[in-house]
Amino acid sequence: MTEFDNLTWLHGKPQGSGLLKANPEDFVVVEDLGFTPDGEGEHILLRILKNGCNTRFVADALAKFLKIHAREVSFAGQKDKHAVTEQWLCARVPGKEMPDFSAFQLEGCKVLEYARHKRKLRLGALKGNAFTLVLREISDRRDVETRLQAIRDGGVPNYFGAQRFGIGGSNLQGALRWAQSNAPVRDRNKRSFWLSAARSALFNQIVHQRLKKPDFNQVVDGDALQLAGRGSWFVATSEELPELQRRVDEKELMITASLPGSGEWGTQRAALAFEQDAIAQETVLQSLLLREKVEASRRAMLLYPQQLSWNWWDDVTVELRFWLPAGSFATSVVRELINTMGDYAHIAE
C-alpha cells in the first residue's frame, strides 16, 4: 500500500515547502447544508461557531444543556478542534417550547442561529464546505502561483486526506488488525473509522495507479462515469468513447474510481481489470470489507475546487478561498501546492 505522502501528484511533486495551520484562524471552514431549516418539527438545527472545540465535545455539551441523551444530538460531519469552524448540529427536542440557547455557555463556542426542523441531520447530509486557508513560510512563491493556476484548470486528485487514516495511520492499522482477527468490534465508532479507512486506502491506491498513466483522464471501455455533482454513474461503451471523452474534457462528466466492497464495483471490461489489478495485493483489506458487508460504491477520481481564489499577503504568505463538495478534503488540495511542514493527520474531516 502506497503511503499517503507518496501518492501520485497530478501536477508533479511541489518544489517548495510551507506551513499549514500556524494557528486556528489559518484554517476556517463554513458548512454549506444546501437547504434551510423547515421552521417546524421535533428537531432543532443550530448553526454554531467554534474555535478550540471538536464536534463531539460540543455535541455532548449541548446534550447536557438540553438534558437529553448524547445520541439525540447529531451532525453532518466532524470538524477540527484546531480551526475556526461554522457547522450545524441537530438536537431532537419534541414540543413547542424553544429552549433559551442564550444560556448555553461553552468556551470557544457560540450559537449563531437556530430553527426547528422535521428531520434528523445525518452524517454526510450536507452539500459541501467553504474553506479559507492561510499558508505561511512558503519557500517558493513562483511554484505555488503556477500550481494554483494549474489547479484552477485541471483540479487535483480526489484523495481521501491523511486525517481519514488517523494519526500515524492508526485507523488503517486498526483495520488491518481487525481483518486478521475473528474478534468482533463492539465499539461502533472504531468499527466505522476502521472500515472507512480501509475503503479509503483502496480508493487512493486505485487513483494513485491511474494517475501514473499519461492518459489517465482518457475514458476507457467500461469506465464508470458520473455527472458532475451527482452520485449515480453509468458505464462507458467503446462505441460512445469519442462523445464521452468530449464531455469529460468539458468537466460535464467525471471518471470515477472504486470504493471497493461487496457487490458490483461499477466498472466493466478494461476499466474493471485495471482497478482489480491496482489493488490485487491488498487482499486483507478487501476481505475485511467483504466480510463486514460494506457495499461497494464510486467516487470521482478528480476534484475541482470551486470558486478558487487567492491573495498573497506577502512573498511567503498566501490566503486561499475555495468550496469543496461534501466528502472532499482541503488537505488534498494543499498537498498539490506545497510540501507541508508537520503532520496534519490530526485535522478532522
Curated annotation (Swiss-Prot):
PROSITE patterns: TRUD, UPF0024. GO terms for cellular component: cytosol. Residues 155-303 form the TRUD domain. GO terms for biological process: pseudouridine synthesis; tRNA pseudouridine synthesis. The active site is at 80 (nucleophile). Pfam families: TruD (PF01142). Its EC number is 5.4.99.27. GO terms for molecular function: pseudouridine synthase activity; RNA binding; tRNA pseudouridine(13) synthase activity. Keywords: Isomerase, tRNA processing. It is an enzyme of class 5 (isomerase). Transmembrane segments: none annotated. CDD domains: PseudoU_synth_EcTruD (cd02575). It catalyses: uridine(13) in tRNA = pseudouridine(13) in tRNA. Responsible for synthesis of pseudouridine from uracil-13 in transfer RNAs. Belongs to the pseudouridine synthase TruD family. This is tRNA pseudouridine synthase D. It comes from Salmonella typhimurium (strain LT2 / SGSC1412 / ATCC 700720). The gene is truD.
